[in-house]
Amino acid sequence: MIFNQTEKQEKEYLQQVITTIHDTINTTSTSVKEHIDTLQEYKDYLWSNKDIDPHEIRSMRESILNHFALGENVIDKRRRLSKILDIPYFGRIDFQEKKDKSQVSPIYIGIHTFYDLNQKKNLIYDWRAPISSMFYDHELGEAFYSSPAGKINGTISLKRQYRIRKGKMEYMIESSVTVHDDILQKELCSNADNKMKNIVTTIQREQNQIIRNENASVLIIQGVAGSGKTSIALHRIAYLLYAQKGQISSKDILIISPNKVFADYISNVLPELGEETVPETSMGQILSDVIDNKYKHQNFFEQVTELLENPTPDFIERIQYKASFEFISLLDKFILYMENNYFKATDIKLTKYITIPAEFINEQFKRFHRYPIRQRFETMTDYILEMMQLQYNLTVSTPEKNQLKKEIKKMFAGNNALQIYKDFFEWIGKPEMFKTRKNRILEYADLAPLAYLHIALNGNNAQSYVKHLLIDEMQDYSPIQYKVIQKLYPCRKTILGDTSQSVNPYGSSTANMIQKAFATGEIMKLCKSYRSTFEITSFAQKIQPNNELEPIMRHGEHPKILPFKNTEEEIQGIADLVNSFRNSHYTSLGIICKTESQAKELVQKFQIYANDISLLSNQSSAYVKGIIITSAHMAKGLEFDEVIIPQTDDKNYHSNIDKSMLYVATTRAMHKLTLTYSVSSPSCRFL
């Protein structure tokens, strides 16, 4: 007989589970109060008895720490239970182990495990638990999961999905497949939110394989636009924190994200899944830190802006060259050349009677070749003085030792990293490939090679505290940047992005290039696009074709291209579209321009029409829901119910990078897409 066979029985059972959760929360609240009271008693006792002996103090300290730890665990348990009250679970499988023919176990699956002490059993299993993997990976019939005890085989006889909101079951669906299409379609039809949401209820089989992959030391995820790759990567982090509890915590993970807005946009996912937020940084910040923030330089946003607004063939060539593997190979050869030619040993007069021969000093420089060049000077000095002491019984003072090290350091002709970098371009016969801007500002493309050289000279100062590194928007980083990351972070990595969405096409990386840069890596692909309707996805495919992309069969309005007589009429037309949006059921509208300067100009023009429009710029630190005007670069990774793309004429969109920006902009739309342009310019070649 099936446990809770009817919907009525399921609804009654849900209320029983919620009641049990409430009871457990009340019990934990009582327990928290007891721990607080006990800690206060200890505090009062210590305050009143200042003459107690050290043994008693030590014993009490242990008791206090123990109560404090227990109290924190109980508070954490209460927090987790409070989180699941509204939606205790979302799925169920009935599983019978092969070895146990009589017992069919109903497995209810939710965000967190809930174990009832009275019944002595799990009422809810965490979605990350080994047994829960069958919900995502298997249909009805034979199934298995991997447990610490080994592979468990059996049969799934029932699979259900539920929509529960605020403790009430809205509906349940019998499902023979992994995630029922009706559930998926309902979730995809919902409005965009101001924060990325968890997707545990709709994780697909191919996504689940990525989330639970614990074998790959470097996992590279190539995911098409709208495939959920960022969300999947964050769910993967949540899974690893669960599966490797005790070995890794949220503070051991680092996310490299494109900007502060995107970092804010994704900040809710891990807390929703019951984990703490993870530290984040940017590639630019990492590279600046390596070179000790010594040099003024372009940032990535400024490089992209220049490529969009004022590109020159020389600038593009410099970016492309520094993103090649040939460039890395030559840089490695130059580092070897520098080791063999930049150190010119000379005799050092240590005392009136003792001279250290240049040949001996040169031998020591080569002896310690495993050390980074500038780290050798200290080791060489110690070794030379040790030899002098053995041979001449000579004792040297600290100032004399420092003077010797200073003399040895002077023998190396490369104490200015920037000058060495310039030397490199002379050495390869391409001095034109290095160019500083006004006020000696470096180009962004020079930052990673300079950091790479700095590591060769000074050592990598490996960030060993980071146990897992997550890199988003992988396509926007060059191979030399990945080489620097390899040296700084020798940990496991999850790297994700989409080659079709590069805002840096002249210095970008494909999944295969990243694999080559790390000399390892497992590539997994996400080809299904869930964000946009079939019509919007098909439209975007004409701009940037991708044969691997599989659109979801969710239909909606066809994208519109609206021509206007002139710019003034185009602005008025966009204002009318904004008014239509206000009267719709949609909650987010993105007006996406090619550049930030165009976005700022549009905001100025719109001041006479509305005061509820926000500018999302490179200076922004948070994503705001509602009507937003922004650039394609800043919109990357975000999604909107409706998108309007102004100025889609051939004058504005004509280059390769323009095409990438247009593709990024169109793929931000979930339900509705409109492009506008003035007929005073030719229509866009990409449409």
Question: Which residue stretches match the model-derived regions?
Answer:
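P-loop NTPase Walker
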Residues: 1-33, 40, 184-303, 636, ...
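Phosphate/oxyanion-binding active-site loops and adjacent basic polyanion-contact surfaces
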Residues: 195, 199, 229-233, 446, ...
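Conserved helicase motor core of SF1/SF2 NTP-dependent helicases
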Residues: 246-247, 251, 260-276, 281-286, ...
